[in-house]
Amino acid sequence: PAIRMDCRSEDIGIWTAGSSIGAFHAAAVVCRFPDLFTKALSMSGTYDLMRFTEAKEPTDAFRVSSPLHFVPRLDGRHLDLLRTRHIQFVTGEGKWENIGESWRLANVLGEKGIPNFVDSWGPDWDHDWVTWRAMMPKYLDEWTKS
């Protein structure tokens, strides 16, 4: 990735972040490519995308793109490397939030020994850009100090 050239470091850890459906992508890209990405900040995520389809069962394409579906089948080097990564789930519990989405993927990851953490900001934080604008700097600040 160009970031390695820009930072003049071949082994710099690359982090990803996203909110709402972007939280899905942030977590999924770390799970798919642990050789490239080291951390994900997934804010107010939606992880079970089956509810947005008309299909009753996941298709093969779905199984390879959804961490809820492909992580349980991981093994070998890919899983070993993923166990050295970290996914931070952060969510409010206010309007339009569903912390259960974060817990569902966190539990799947935990069953495979993949480091993750769910952090609830409580009922005063809604599924909204104001929430994410407060969340992102907090975690980036913590991560850059560690």
Annotate each PLM feature.
Residues 1-146:
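Non-catalytic cap/lid and distal C-terminal segments of serine-dependent acyl enzymes
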